[in-house]
Amino acid sequence: MAVRKSNPLTPARRGMSFSDFAEITRATPHKSLLSKLSKTGGRNNHGRITARHIGGGHKRRYRLVDFRRSDKDGVKAKVAHIEYDPNRTARIALLHFLDGAKRYILAPSGLKQGDVVESGSSADIRPGNSLCIRDIPVGTILHAVELRPGQGAKLARSAGSSVRLSAKDGDFAILKLPSGEIRMVSLSCRATIGEVGNGQRLNVSLGKAGRSRWCGVRPSVRGVAMNPVDHPHGGGEGKTSGGRHPVSPWGRPEGKTRRANKPSDRFIIRRKSRKRR
């Protein structure tokens, strides 16, 4: 993927850049691997907003991506197409298996139309192949990693992300995540070789608010710009800093997002590195 800059014909296009989509080989998705995707507008079944900054956006259909790949062990597949997926930052690859099945997977960096991929213990260490972590050598770059065996991939699924297999200790593998966190997962968990493609996506500049609206993202208003009835930071004479440590609209301290009693915390060896403010 390469990033193209637009000509400064308007103020919005002056700072705008976009992907050239050179890796995309087909525009229309495979019909049997689509499902309906309804919009919620961030509302629950009572019509109340439970997730802010969501609404509008282009109509989408969900692409059924295979995050397990365990039922096709030993069956080789050919990459028929690399396709765009509006529901994620990564590209997806359409696989045609020798037994006639068709599946979508995340397209790793370097995977091309016509390549052959495989899953199972006999698969080579090559981008796009899926194996149990116990069959993967230490130091390999991985993506689409399971947290529990058979659960389906949970880690390193967005564009350009990857996990490094640092070591193996007993029945566990030690992984270094993109955030800097080091954690253990079972050697029976599956992972896919390589890093997720479309890594240059971070260099794309939207250029105007409308491109966010096309994606279904609504504006985010600062608390200090609100009234006291709307936010703890609201009000004051003139412009103020809020007068207190940053909090959510409901008064909870900002920045802490991880649940305190999450069961999988016992597998974390080192927490993710804090970003400097």
From Swiss-Prot:
Q: Where is the composition biased (Basic and acidic residues)?
A: 253-268
Family annotation (PROSITE patterns)? RIBOSOMAL_L2
Q: Does the keyword Kinase apply?
A: no
Q: Which GO terms describe its biological process?
A: cytoplasmic translation
Record key words, sorted: Ribonucleoprotein, Ribosomal protein, RNA-binding, rRNA-binding
This entry carries the following GO cellular component terms, namely:
large ribosomal subunit
Q: Which InterPro entries match?
A: NA-bd_OB-fold (IPR012340), Rib_uL2_dom2 (IPR014722), Ribosomal_uL2 (IPR002171), Ribosomal_uL2_bac/org-type (IPR005880), Ribosomal_uL2_C (IPR022669), Ribosomal_uL2_CS (IPR022671), Ribosomal_uL2_dom3 (IPR014726), Ribosomal_uL2_RNA-bd_dom (IPR022666)
* Pfam families per record: Ribosomal_L2 (PF00181), Ribosomal_L2_C (PF03947)
Q: Which family does it belong to?
A: Belongs to the universal ribosomal protein uL2 family.
Quaternary structure annotation from Swiss-Prot or TrEMBL: Part of the 50S ribosomal subunit. Forms a bridge to the 30S subunit in the 70S ribosome.
Q: What does this protein do?
A: One of the primary rRNA binding proteins. Required for association of the 30S and 50S subunits to form the 70S ribosome, for tRNA binding and peptide bond formation. It has been suggested to have peptidyltransferase activity; this is somewhat controversial. Makes several contacts with the 16S rRNA in the 70S ribosome.
The name of this protein is Large ribosomal subunit protein uL2
This protein's species is Tropheryma whipplei (strain Twist) (Whipple's bacillus)
Recall the taxonomic lineage recorded for the source organism: Bacteria, Bacillati, Actinomycetota, Actinomycetes, Micrococcales
